[in-house]
């Protein structure tokens, strides 16, 4: 914001000495806004006491206040605003009793906050940035030209202080107003969702998209001009480096750089925060829809039970068996006794060791297909191997055979996209689906 030349104790003493105070209840604030609106329609910017009373009458009717004491209450309101330095009163001896009123800078500032600053305009922001860019370029050119102290004050310091800095403050104020608008939109969305959220979904989407679009327009406009503004500020800063007596310009440039960085960074941060809120609202709506489905079902079921004797019904439900995956990649061979002969050397060994031995044997035997370039039909090969082992080990042996086979090569038929035929690999219903491996 603007730089203050007074210290905190000085400002406090000044405010206490002048007895500054502002008290604006909603009816008085509405009266001030009405005065500002009517004043904006006049070319001279002046209003008579009768016009102020008419404006107060409109406000009084809107608040449904009695009209019997309208004159007294209007006079009290006008005097109170004059005392609070919101209105200036001008009287003359020639027109005694017909005073002229003008809004003070404080009154204009308050009404401007509530009226003129409430609407965001990309065109207005673009014009402000265009003016700033022009002022900065002229100041940078003047700084590079150099000159005496008067030259630096008039052509560099003054434009930066009284034009660029004020426009930066105006842009900063626009961002702060956007912050308030975001909070107001959040309150509106909360009220909509608390009432009839189904009917409010479209309204919520509109509010969310409008606010997102406004924030994005603001940030895009700032980022488009930000680099050029920073470049001109750096030009001025470079020009002051060789002058020891220009600390006041260098400090002002540093403040402007910090202010511009803060404006751009907060714009992006505001967008990020709004995106997070947008996702939160959509998540809430999806959750509410899911919960509402359950509530609708429960309500219908409750009504059906209550009216069962008048309208009998039958309930059919399906309870499918759960599918359990009994396969385990690290599962050992079954411990129970199985039929068939097993070599004594392998009887008490762990399956991992058995698997290594089987893999080595099968790899050596399958290598013949690759050496001779003979097609390898997995269905026939697996069936041949499984016939040598008991049923309890068929799954493990088949997995080893297939693992070793696919390492040798691929089936060209796999690239056609056509599925292979299922082939039985034992007498117990096990099948395998694989093309013939013909490319090693």
Curated annotation (Swiss-Prot):
Where does the protein end up? Answer: Cytoplasm, Nucleoid
Region spans: Leucine-zipper = 208-236
Keyword field contains Cytoplasm? yes
Task: Note the superkingdom of the native organism.
Answer: Bacteria
In terms of InterPro entries, this protein maps to:
Chromosome_partition_MukF, MukF_C, MukF_C_sf, MukF_M, MukF_M_sp, MukF_WHTH, WH-like_DNA-bd_sf, WH_DNA-bd_sf
- What residue range is the signal peptide? none
Q: Name one Pfam family in it.
A: MukF_M
Q: Could you give a GO molecular-function term held by this entry? A: calcium ion binding
- Gene Ontology biological process terms in this record: cell division; chromosome condensation; chromosome segregation; DNA replication
GO CC terms: cytoplasm; nucleoid
Q: Which UniProt keywords apply?
A: Calcium, Cell cycle, Cell division, Chromosome partition, Cytoplasm, DNA condensation
Q: Which family does it belong to?
A: Belongs to the MukF family.
Fetch the NCBIfam families from UniProt.
PRK05260.1 (NF003615)
> Assembly and partners?
Interacts, and probably forms a ternary complex, with MukE and MukB via its C-terminal region. The complex formation is stimulated by calcium or magnesium. It is required for an interaction between MukE and MukB.
- What is this protein's function? Involved in chromosome condensation, segregation and cell cycle progression. May participate in facilitating chromosome segregation by condensation DNA from both sides of a centrally located replisome during cell division. Not required for mini-F plasmid partitioning. Probably acts via its interaction with MukB and MukE. Overexpression results in anucleate cells. It has a calcium binding activity.
HAMAP family per record: MukF
Recorded protein name is: Chromosome partition protein MukF
Q: Which organism is it from?
A: Escherichia coli O9:H4 (strain HS)
Taxonomic lineage per UniProt? Bacteria, Pseudomonadati, Pseudomonadota, Gammaproteobacteria, Enterobacterales
């Amino acid at each position: 914001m603007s730089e203050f030349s007074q210290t905190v104790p000085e400002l406090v003493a000044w405010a206490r000495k002048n007895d500054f105070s502002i008290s604006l209840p909603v009816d008085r604030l509405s009266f001030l806004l009405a005065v500002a609106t009517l004043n904006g329609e006049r070319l001279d910017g002046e209003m008579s006491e009768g016009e102020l009373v008419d404006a107060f009458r409109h406000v009084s009717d809107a608040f449904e206040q009695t009209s019997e004491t309208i004159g007294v209450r209007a006079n009290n309101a006008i005097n109170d605003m004059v005392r609070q330095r919101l209105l200036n009163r001008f009287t003359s001896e020639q027109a005694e009793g017909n005073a002229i009123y003008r809004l003070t800078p404080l009154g204009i500032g308050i009404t401007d906050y509530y009226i003129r600053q409430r609407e965001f305009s990309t065109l207005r922001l673009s014009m402000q940035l265009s003016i700033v860019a022009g002022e900065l370029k002229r100041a940078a050119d003047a700084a590079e030209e150099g000159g005496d102290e008067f030259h630096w004050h008039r052509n560099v310091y003054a434009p930066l202080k009284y034009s660029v800095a004020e426009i930066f403050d105006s842009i900063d104020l626009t961002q702060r107003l956007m912050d308030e608008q975001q909070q107001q939109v959040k309150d509106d969305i909360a009220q909509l969702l608390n009432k009839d959220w189904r009917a409010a979904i479209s309204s919520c989407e509109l509010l969310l998209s409008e606010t997102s679009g406004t924030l994005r327009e603001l940030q895009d406009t700032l980022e488009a001009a930000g680099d050029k503004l920073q470049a001109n500020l750096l030009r001025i800063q470079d020009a002051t480096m060789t002058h020891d007596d220009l600390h006041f310009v260098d400090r002002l440039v540093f403040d402007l750089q910090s202010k511009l960085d803060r404006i751009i960074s907060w714009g992006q941060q505001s967008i990020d925060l709004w995106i997070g809120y947008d996702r939160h609202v959509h998540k809430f709506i999806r959750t509410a829809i899911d919960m509402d489905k359950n509530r609708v079902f429960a309500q219908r079921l409750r009504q059906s039970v209550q009216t069962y004797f008048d309208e009998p019904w039958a309930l059919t439900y399906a309870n499918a068996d759960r599918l359990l995956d009994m396969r385990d990649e690290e599962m050992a061979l079954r411990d129970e006794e199985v039929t068939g002969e097993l070599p004594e050397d392998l009887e008490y060994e762990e399956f991992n060791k058995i698997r290594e031995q089987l893999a080595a044997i099968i790899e050596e035997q399958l290598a013949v297909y690759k050496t001779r370039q003979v097609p390898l039909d997995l269905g026939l090969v697996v069936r041949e191997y499984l016939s040598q082992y008991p049923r309890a080990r068929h799954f493990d042996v088949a997995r080893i055979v297939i693992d070793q086979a696919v390492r040798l090569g691929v089936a060209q038929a796999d690239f056609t996209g056509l599925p292979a035929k299922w082939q039985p690999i034992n007498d117990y219903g096990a099948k395998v689906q694989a093309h013939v491996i013909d490319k090693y």
